[in-house]
Regions:
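Short beta-strand elements
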Residues: 1002-1013
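Fungal secretory targeting signals
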Residues: 1-28
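Glycoside hydrolase catalytic-domain context in secreted enzymes
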Residues: 27-978, 984-1001
Length: 1013
């Protein structure tokens, strides 16, 4: 009995879940249950598809021992031979906690050597191959979405696919396809915007690009990992229509495109964890979408052994499932702590042999029925079959007895490309996409492009440190170590402007700060160094305390307390696998805002407390929930919680090994504050850490220098940024703060624009930011996080070598209150361990940081109540709020005219829309006409419809005076709505308006279509 059938028989669908009886009416092509996959057909003749059938895959499962099956579904951090080339070195490494000598990959699953099944080596994405190894740092995926270009998406995936294989990886944790729902979500830059249709179109081609190179693409995070704060403690309360129409379509598109794997999310959906959610994993993913591939958990996203029964295939590291760790559950479904090595699966093995008992309701943990050994065996066999199916799709099973290259136990792997040989082509793709993504938001008086005359006289002034310190990408799982030197926008602009051109640079904003002087810090009054200047340094336990509690003291081989004049460790003084605490007091000499800067490398975690969590919960900073990766190059999750503002996190220009976290805090004159910094060294390398700041006086002087230079400049180009990262949302718990540019960048822009009326702002942002200065500057160019070729790409756009053609995949509000998750009643200061909805923040539960207080704490913590189908531009239309810049907006250096609309609604339930677009300007450029469908004149009762929704688009490049007829097919699926009554897609019949425009608000043509069955 297969798992899907066993669930139907057992009737395990909880009554609290939405009933979704799928009739299979989806119009998208279904890959079917076949182990093979479409083969690649290109000029190189490379074939990625495997030859095994589903029957042969089942037979291969039958040949495996119980121990081999259990081993295969247990994920681990990395294997000891992860850097070995399968053609010449070890292929089947044992699982090891050591990262020494490895590529810094994210995950690892064992193979079966005797059957020729290789292990699976797994890398993070989704903006390039994220390892402790160099790769091409691509533009952020939100920038890819801004291209509205399917072919660019295919190229984007191709780069990751071939580079991943070149670095001996088999699985890529990408694309990320969670909607931009919360405007300040830390990982918005990793995803593809706020619109489900656009996301589905882009992800389909990205997946094809990845998998045709022989790398398994992993769609993540299934489902609704739409923000970072409290992502592990959030329940998503979502209705059936919204789930089907907004959250699931991109995953369906990715499945239809052949994605080999799905990563289930941390959150719960309608009270059930995503990684044990029968509705999502079995009813939707398996039966509705026809997915036969591999479902793996996010790291730490599993909770019970029964996750395997309910649809999970593989538990990745840090999870409670499959006997990996204890859980708050009295049932005997777990492996006792300390018994067996990670991944031995002792409890699962016992369940397969003897079955498992029923477990009653435990607090808010639901009851679990008893399962027989046969049911566990069927679930385990299904899980292994799904993993093998994914491997077969990219040709990883050709060395098995059923493969085309059976070698009697040795694996056969397709040739891997040489990484160095890929650089020229991949760099070009990276730069092309960065240029295509360039989104011109404003351009009064044709301020851009910069012209030859602008560089005469005082010339062009460039302001902002990210013009000289290239802003490559965001943090967390998406951080990529770029190949080679990364050219900056400033040096590319100087080179492009030509010899003798006037281009000056003034920082204006301090990205790095200065070392805190010893005289500014006093030792704690209760220490042996009371009355002296400096920091009390104490060695502490390496066990991270929960919820900001005081750390335990060091218990063995401890260093004596020391008085450090400053926190400045860049050598080997702080050994690997140790933990340290620095405490001191600071009295503000004057009122103002202070930028606190933390640099760290080789840290597994770091925390900074201002005035102590117990004294003031709003003064806590958490720096290192996301550990630094191999060699210290990985990104720390430098997060700010509870009101301290994250102002910067980038590479320290003096050392690529350091990561920087910066925070803004306001002090009154004469106030004394306590500072408490804790840092935990990575197990593999000595800790390096430095504490710096930017004082209020220094900020004033920085702005004044920029203003003085701007007075005489022909034009001022200001580079500003925000940063997203995994594990925290921008602004901590305060969305209004998170929507602003960090630090004093807003003040810098306002001051420069006040003295130079030809000010241009270049944004490196991964999501919406409010722009109080938008009316004071002439031009605004959004370059997103442009990757390692972002410098030349930015210069080309500024100089007019490339005309911007990007369109916003997100809406930009004019005020923090004009976002769908804003609530005037939300009170983030109300911190409680027993919500839901304490503080009246149901639209943004990330306002809290609840934790599991003890093992018997309820798993229900906070609820996220969605706005139904009204997100992004749909919400703005629904409530009648005008955004600052609408979804789909983007200007060009030329102009386009739309005309001659024709609508053919007689094509078998679909619609073909055609119209003419003409370039009426004097420059060549790209335009993205967009097609929006209006709501039906007589909508079904109980069903919501957007005022208009995106149903089609095309990107066209036109020379001056050139015209083209654009034809866009609108499928029947896009004319349908999800019927809660029928639990299926139903065409909304009758007359529907069609809007063709340059954005969701800039409508150029209108028409009507008669839609029938």
């Amino acid at each position: 009995m297969h798992r899907e059938d066993s669930l139907r028989t057992l009737g395990l669908v909880a009554a609290s879940l939405l009933c979704m009886c799928i009739s299979g009416a989806a119009a998208l092509p279904n890959p079917g249950e076949h182990g093979g996959h479409d083969r690649r057909d290109d000029r190189r003749g490379f074939t990625s598809g495997g030859t095994l059938t589903a029957t042969q895959l089942r037979q291969l499962v039958a040949q495996m021992t119980l121990a081999e099956k259990v081993s295969m579904i247990h994920g681990a951090p990395e294997g000891t031979a992860c850097n070995s080339n399968p053609a010449s070195g070890p292929v089947f490494p044992v699982i090891s906690p050591s990262f020494a000598g490895c590529a810094g990959q994210a995950g690892y699953n064992n193979g079966v050597p005797r059957l020729g099944i290789p292990p699976l080596r797994q890398t993070d994405g989704p903006a390039g191959i994220r390892l402790g190894h160099e790769a091409t740092a691509l533009p952020a995926p939100v920038g890819l979405a801004a291209t509205f270009d399917r072919s660019a998406a295919r190229d984007f995936g191709t780069v990751m696919g071939r580079e991943g294989r070149a670095i001996n990886q088999d699985v890529l944790y990408a694309p990320m396809i969670n909607l931009v729902t919360v405007a300040t979500a830390g990982r918005n830059f990793e995803t593809l915007g706020e619109d489900a249709f656009l996301m589905g179109q882009i992800v389909s081609d990205e997946v094809r690009g990845i998998q045709r190179e022989g790398l398994i693409a992993t769609l993540k995070h299934f489902a609704m990992n739409d923000f970072e704060n409290a992502r592990m403690q959030t329940n998503i309360a979502i209705d059936e229509q919204t789930l089907q129409e907004l959250e699931l379509p991109a995953f369906e598109h990715g499945v239809r495109a052949g994605a080999g794997a799905i990563m289930c999310a941390y959150s719960r959906v309608n009270d059930v964890y995503s990684c044990s959610n029968d509705l999502l994993l079995n009813q939707v993913l398996r039966r509705q979408f026809g997915f036969t591939g591999w479902v793996l958990s996010d790291f730490g996203a599993t909770h019970r052994l029964t996750d395997l029964i309910y649809g999970l295939d593989s538990a990745m590291p840090q999870g409670n499932n499959a006997g990996l760790r204890d859980e708050p559950d009295p049932g005997n479904l777990r492996e006792p702590p300390g018994v067996g090595a990670p991944g031995t699966g002792r409890t699962l093995t016992s369940a397969v042999i003897s079955g498992s008992p029923a477990v009653p309701v435990f607090n808010d943990w639901p009851a679990v029925p008893a399962f027989t050994g046969a049911q566990w065996q069927a679930a385990l066999d299904d899980a292994v079959f799904h993993i093998l199916t994914s491997m077969n799709r990219v040709g990883l099973l050709e060395g098995t007895p059923f493969g085309s290259h059976d070698t009697g136990g040795a694996p056969f792997l397709l040739p891997r490309p040489d990484l160095a040989s890929l650089k020229p082509a991949d760099f070009k793709i990276a730069q092309d996409i960065a240029e295509e993504s360039a989104t011109l938001l404003k351009n009064e008086h044709q301020a851009l492009p910069l012209r030859h005359g602008d560089f005469h006289g005082a010339g062009v002034l460039v302001v902002g440190p990210t013009s000289v310190t290239p802003y490559v990408g965001g943090g967390g799982s998406a951080h990529v170590i770029p190949f080679d030197e990364v050219p900056s926008p400033f040096e590319a602009l100087v080179a492009g402007a030509g010899r003798g051109a006037g281009v000056r640079y003034v920082p204006g904003y301090d990205l790095d700060g200065e070392l805190v002087p010893p005289a500014a810090i006093g030792a704690p009054a209760d220490s042996a160094f009371a009355g002296q200047h400096g920091w009390l340094r104490t060695q502490i336990s390496t066990v991270l305390p929960a919820n900001g509690a005081a750390p335990d003291p060091c218990s063995a081989a401890c260093a004596a307390d020391q008085l450090d004049p400053s926190v400045d460790y860049a050598a080997t003084t702080l050994p690997a696998a140790t933990a340290w605490r620095w405490q001191g007091t600071f009295t503000a000499p004057s009122a103002g805002t202070w930028q606190l800067k933390i640099f760290a490398a080789h840290q597994s975690n770091a925390q900074l407390f201002v005035d102590g969590l117990a004294t003031n919960p709003n003064r806590r900073i958490n720096l290192g929930l996301y550990a630094s990766g191999g060699g210290g190059f990985g990104t720390s999750n430098l997060a700010s919680w509870h009101g301290l503002v994250q102002t910067a996190k980038s590479h320290d220009p003096s050392s690529a090994r350091f990561q920087q976290g910066g925070f803004t805090v306001t002090f009154a004159a004469g106030e004394t504050h306590t500072l408490d910094l804790r840092a935990y060294a990575d197990p593999s390398a000595p800790l390096q850490v430095r504490f710096e700041w930017v004082t209020p006086d220094w900020q004033v002087r920085s702005i004044a220098a920029a203003v003085q230079a701007a007075r005489t400049a022909t034009k001022a180009v200001i580079f500003v940024y925000d940063e997203g990262t995994e594990g925290s949302d921008r602004g901590g718990n305060d969305q209004a703060v998170g929507l602003r540019l960090p630090g004093y960048q807003d003040a810098l822009i306002a001051a420069v624009a006040a003295v130079n009326h030809h000010t241009i702002v270049v944004l490196n942002a991964g999501d919406p930011v409010v722009m109080p200065w938008a009316g004071d500057v002439e031009a605004i160019l959004q370059m997103w996080y442009p990757g390692q070729r972002g410098g030349p790409a930015t210069a080309n756009v500024l100089l007019g070598n490339t005309s911007p053609g990007g369109k916003l995949p997100i809406s930009i509000p004019d005020d923090p209150s004009h976002i769908s998750t804003f609530s005037p009643d939300c009170n983030p200061a109300v911190i409680s361990s027993s919500p839901p909805n304490d503080g009246n923040c149901p639209l943004y539960p990330g306002a809290f940081e609840p934790g599991f207080i003890s093992g018997d704490h309820s798993y229900k913590t906070i609820d996220f109540v969605t706005n139904g189908i009204f997100r992004g531009y749909r919400w703005h239309d629904h409530v009648g709020v005008e955004p600052l810049f609408p979804f789909g907006h983007g200007l060009s250096y030329t102009q386009f005219r739309y005309s001659d609309l024709d609508i053919d609604d007689s094509r078998g339930g679909g619609i073909e829309v055609s119209f003419v677009v003409r370039n009426i300007g004097r420059d060549g450029g790209a335009e993205v006409p967009q097609i929006y469908l209006g709501s039906p004149s007589n909508p079904p009762i109980g069903t919501d419809f957007a005022l208009r929704k995106l149903v089609g688009f095309a990107r066209v490049d036109l020379k001056p005076g050139q015209a083209t007829r654009v034809k866009v097919r609108i499928d029947r699926r896009e004319l349908s709505y999800w019927s809660v009554a029928q639990h299926d897609w139903v065409v909304a019949e009758g007359s529907r308006a069609l809007y063709i425009g340059a954005s969701s608000r800039d409508i150029r043509l209108r028409g009507q279509a008669r839609i029938g069955r």
